[in-house]
């Protein structure tokens, strides 16, 4: 999509930078949320005018200028989506078609969650899962796992082998190591 954004910003002679600089680690961030759902997440950043007008090291920065840049970038996105429609649809179809393969390679086959310990948070989690079409099942019989008892009717199991397997991993896993040392500091952010 970058060429489409670039063309629209070139048309208004606006300066821009069109490269990928940072990986997306936190799935609660807008541009990353699409990535985990088979979409293409895009982050636009620009200097804020903080008001109608402010001084910057490159001169006056106005609110109207900021809005114009965002508007033109949005038109660039529309241009690109129209031109690349079939590519985006194919990408998303393949993303979900590979879900079973991705799930089979995951060592974790499901998440067992006790609803009794913090019922309100657990209910909020279940609602979030339902909004994302993630299946969670009531525990049919009481079990003990690693010395912890999970009672029938007071726990759920979330299998990872379902179309939203990547999202399940994204919200349940706690990532504490990163391959790249250069990133926005979101290392303490997590959805669980």
What are these regions (language model features)?
Residues 1-16, 20-26, 30-192:
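Intrinsic-disorder/low-complexity accessory segments
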């Amino acid at each position: 999509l970058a060429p489409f954004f670039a063309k629209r910003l070139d048309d208004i002679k606006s300066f821009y930078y069109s490269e990928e600089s940072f990986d997306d680690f936190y799935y609660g961030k807008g541009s990353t949320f699409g990535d985990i759902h088979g979409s293409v997440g895009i982050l636009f950043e620009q200097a804020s005018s903080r008001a109608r007008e402010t001084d910057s090291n490159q001169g006056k920065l106005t609110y109207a200028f900021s809005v114009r840049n965002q508007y033109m970038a949005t038109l660039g996105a529309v241009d690109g989506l129209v031109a690349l429609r079939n590519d985006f649809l194919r990408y998303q179809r393949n993303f979900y078609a590979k879900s079973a393969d991705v799930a089979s390679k995951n060592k974790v086959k499901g998440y067992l969650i006790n609803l009794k310990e913090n019922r309100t948070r657990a209910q909020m989690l279940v609602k979030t899962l339902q909004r994302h079409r993630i299946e969670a099942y009531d525990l049919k019989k009481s079990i003990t796992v690693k010395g912890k008892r999970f009672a029938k009717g007071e726990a759920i199991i979330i299998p990872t082998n379902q179309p939203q397997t990547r999202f399940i991993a994204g919200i349940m896993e706690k990532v504490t190591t990163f391959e790249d040392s250069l990133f926005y500091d979101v290392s303490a952010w997590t959805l669980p």
